């Protein structure tokens, strides 16, 4: 009974220490939960978004354009999903826009705010630029001398990290954005570039596919999704959050444990006579060790309970 009464008295005598240790525990657990939830959330959202919107396995360009009537043959021969993607870069005063013609099979865009396009004078634009430059739904943007009404914002899987060029170091959402318009409006721009998107199946011969494409159409550039920063940055950010979560989970409690060890060690030295008296009263070494261990566990238990509540 004597030892049990000492718990409350010890806490009162060393209140500032117990409060500080409990606060450190609370901070460590909260930071862990926040970063862990953020990391797993980003990872889960990205993976599902990639699936829903048919993320590419690779993008490539060629010196010789692949005829449209060859696409079906390529898909059958190599057991791949293959699509020619049309786009055009347009420089306007204060911004640069990359307008895409809508894909049907690979790297589909998803309107996340507002509505999709339905008329030739409407566009949807990438969400990052809209938020950065305060472009509201209903505003009008000029593209190649014609005004288009913004009807919504979108994301697409191969541009979740908005790099204008794949070898850029930093994203650009202040002067560069993506846009979609109707096919007829896109055709009216009268200027277009193309690149090719491919999704391999489990039994696709990737090496043979690339070899044949190069022999027939002379590949200019080839970028696999695992080397595409616009895509991999999502996983990289998720991993960064998860690493930080476990760094907080281990480092802050270690600091707390070190502080507790110092304080409890000093307390044991100060109470040597009392420990001797308690031993004489019949308390075993094991009971005394448990007593001081409980004193050390109080801050951690208190912090854990506070976070749980």
Where are these regions (language model features)?
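Juxtamembrane/interface motifs at transmembrane-helix termini
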Residues: 40-41, 276-277, 308-309
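Hydrophobic alpha-helical transmembrane segments that constitute the membrane-spanning cores
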Residues: 251, 295-309
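Mid-sequence acidic-hydrophobic segments that form the walls
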Residues: 132, 291, 304
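Interfacial "coupling" helices/loops that link adjacent transmembrane helices in transporter permeases
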Residues: 9, 14, 258-298
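Membrane transport/envelope proteins' first extracytoplasmic loop
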Residues: 1-257, 266
């Amino acid at each position: 009974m004597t030892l049990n009464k000492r718990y409350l008295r010890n806490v009162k005598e060393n209140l500032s220490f117990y409060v500080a240790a409990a606060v450190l525990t609370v901070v460590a657990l909260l930071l862990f939960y926040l970063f862990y939830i953020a990391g797993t959330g980003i990872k889960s959202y990205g993976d599902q978004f990639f699936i829903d919107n048919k993320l590419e396995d690779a993008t490539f360009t060629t010196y010789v354009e692949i005829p449209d009537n060859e696409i079906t043959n390529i898909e059958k021969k190599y057991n791949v999903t293959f699509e020619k993607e049309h786009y055009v870069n347009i420089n306007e005063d204060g911004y640069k826009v990359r307008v895409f013609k809508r894909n049907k099979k690979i790297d589909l865009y998803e309107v996340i705010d507002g509505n999709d396009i339905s008329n030739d004078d409407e566009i949807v634009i990438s969400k990052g630029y809209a938020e950065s430059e305060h472009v509201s739904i209903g505003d009008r943007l000029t593209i190649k001398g014609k005004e288009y009404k913004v009807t919504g914002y979108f994301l697409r899987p191969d541009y979740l990290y908005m790099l204008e060029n794949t070898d850029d170091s930093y994203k650009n959402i202040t002067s560069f954005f993506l846009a979609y318009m109707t096919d007829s409006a896109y055709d009216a721009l009268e200027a277009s570039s193309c690149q090719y998107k491919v999704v391999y199946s489990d039994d696709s011969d990737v090496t043979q596919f690339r070899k044949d494409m190069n022999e027939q159409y002379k590949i200019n550039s080839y970028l696999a999704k695992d080397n595409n920063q616009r895509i991999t940055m999502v996983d990289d950010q998720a991993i960064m959050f998860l690493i930080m979560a476990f760094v907080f989970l281990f480092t802050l409690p270690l600091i707390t444990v070190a502080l507790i060890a110092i304080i409890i060690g000093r307390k044991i030295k100060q109470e040597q006579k009392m420990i001797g008296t308690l031993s004489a009263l019949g308390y075993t070494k094991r009971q005394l060790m448990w007593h001081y261990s409980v004193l050390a566990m109080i801050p951690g238990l208190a912090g854990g309970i506070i976070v749980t509540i």
